């Protein structure tokens, strides 16, 4: 599932190309994705100017000049790409936005696990996003903040940094990579982390996410940016997907385990912990 780096990459690839364009028409090829599409979607954003393209957590947000915003979640296999005027619609193209420059913005989703909503812009932070945690690349992620969220939590730190109520956008791949970089065992309980470990973890999360954004995100199967290009952070993965391979730091064997049904990869030597 696309996480913060993938959605940030998508935003970066679309923003400059979409701002000031007009949505001339919206065509719904079906009435539902993961959830039912609003029957008012076309009427509420047709003939409106695009003011901004931004991201919050794993959501892509397109703001219009009529105080509405389009919220896009890619789900497992969603793609949101710009296509030329002569583009021929494909099987899983579910929503088509005709733009004033002749191009088309296409939402394609093979598994139909993605979501598209349209809301009043001022509704987003007040209601839709009010339970989300801090952005990991912002100044809001501090030692004091994260310590306050971990200090009573006798839950593995891997689960906690993937909790969007604490920190948004640190998905499964980036959690394993960040914990490895910080040399913290994924099973260590949040309440047992020392201050220096929390500081190291914050630094590692930021470093991993920044590198992933620079590489255009991680494409394991479906993700592409708005220009239909894959991400290349896969080539920089240090532990994720490397079960039974040698650790790049110490040559120990990379271990694969599970946390809440999600695969976790770590080095038992570099991330050694006497207790969790």
Curated annotation (Swiss-Prot):
Instruction: Note the zinc finger regions (FPG-type) by start and end residue.
Output: 238-272
Q: Which PROSITE patterns match?
A: FPG_CAT, ZF_FPG_1, ZF_FPG_2
Q: Where is the signal peptide?
A: none
A GO MF annotation of the entry reads:
8-oxo-7,8-dihydroguanine DNA N-glycosylase activity
- Which keywords fit this entry according to its UniProt record? DNA damage, DNA repair, DNA-binding, Glycosidase, Hydrolase, Lyase, Metal-binding, Multifunctional enzyme, Zinc, Zinc-finger
**InterPro entries tied to this protein:** DNA_glyclase/AP_lyase_DNA-bd, DNA_glyclase_Znf_dom_DNA_BS, Formamido-pyr_DNA_Glyclase, FPG_cat, MutM-like_N-ter, Ribosomal_uS13-like_H2TH, Znf_DNA_glyclase/AP_lyase, Znf_FPG/IleRS
Q: Which SMART domains match?
A: Fapy_DNA_glyco (SM00898), H2TH (SM01232)
Cofactor(s) needed by this chain: Zn(2+)
The catalysed reaction is: Hydrolysis of DNA containing ring-opened 7-methylguanine residues, releasing 2,6-diamino-4-hydroxy-5-(N-methyl)formamidopyrimidine; 2'-deoxyribonucleotide-(2'-deoxyribose 5'-phosphate)-2'-deoxyribonucleotide-DNA = a 3'-end 2'-deoxyribonucleotide-(2,3-dehydro-2,3-deoxyribose 5'-phosphate)-DNA + a 5'-end 5'-phospho-2'-deoxyribonucleoside-DNA + H(+)
Per the entry, what this protein does is: Involved in base excision repair of DNA damaged by oxidation or by mutagenic agents. Acts as a DNA glycosylase that recognizes and removes damaged bases. Has a preference for oxidized purines, such as 7,8-dihydro-8-oxoguanine (8-oxoG). Has AP (apurinic/apyrimidinic) lyase activity and introduces nicks in the DNA strand. Cleaves the DNA backbone by beta-delta elimination to generate a single-strand break at the site of the removed base with both 3'- and 5'-phosphates.
The protein's assembly and partners = Monomer.
Report the NCBIfam families cross-referenced here: fpg, PRK01103.1
Can you say what this protein is called? Formamidopyrimidine-DNA glycosylase
Q: Which organism is it from?
A: Rickettsia felis (strain ATCC VR-1525 / URRWXCal2)
Which taxonomic lineage does the organism of this UniProt entry have?
Bacteria, Pseudomonadati, Pseudomonadota, Alphaproteobacteria, Rickettsiales
């Amino acid at each position: 599932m696309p996480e913060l780096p993938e959605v940030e990459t998508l935003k970066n690839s679309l923003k400059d190309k979409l701002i000031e364009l007009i949505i001339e028409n919206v065509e719904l090829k079906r009435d539902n994705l993961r959830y039912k599409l609003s029957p008012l979607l076309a009427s509420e954003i047709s003939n409106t100017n695009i003011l901004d393209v931004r991201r919050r957590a794993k959501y892509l947000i397109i703001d219009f000049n009529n105080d509405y915003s389009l919220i896009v979640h890619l789900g497992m296999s969603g793609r949101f790409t710009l296509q030329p005027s002569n583009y021929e619609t494909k099987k899983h193209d579910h929503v088509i936005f005709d733009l004033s420059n002749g191009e088309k913005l296409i939402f394609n989703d093979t598994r139909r696990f993605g979501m598209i909503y349209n809301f009043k812009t001022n509704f987003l932070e007040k209601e839709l996003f009010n339970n989300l945690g801090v952005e990991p690349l912002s100044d809001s992620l501090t030692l004091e903040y994260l310590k306050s969220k971990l200090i009573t939590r006798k839950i593995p730190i891997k689960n906690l940094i993937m909790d969007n109520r604490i920190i948004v956008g640190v998905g499964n791949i980036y959690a394993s990579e960040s914990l490895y970089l910080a040399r913290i065992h994924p099973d260590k309980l949040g309440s047992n982390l020392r201050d220096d470990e929390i500081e190291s973890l914050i630094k590692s999360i930021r470093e991993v996410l920044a590198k992933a954004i620079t590489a255009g995100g991680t494409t394991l199967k479906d993700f592409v940016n708005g220009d239909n290009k894959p991400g290349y952070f896969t080539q920089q993965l240090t532990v994720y997907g490397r079960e039974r391979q040698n650790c790049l730091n110490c040559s120990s064997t990379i271990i694969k385990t599970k946390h809440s049904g999600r695969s976790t990869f770590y080095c038992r030597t570099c991330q050694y912990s006497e207790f969790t």
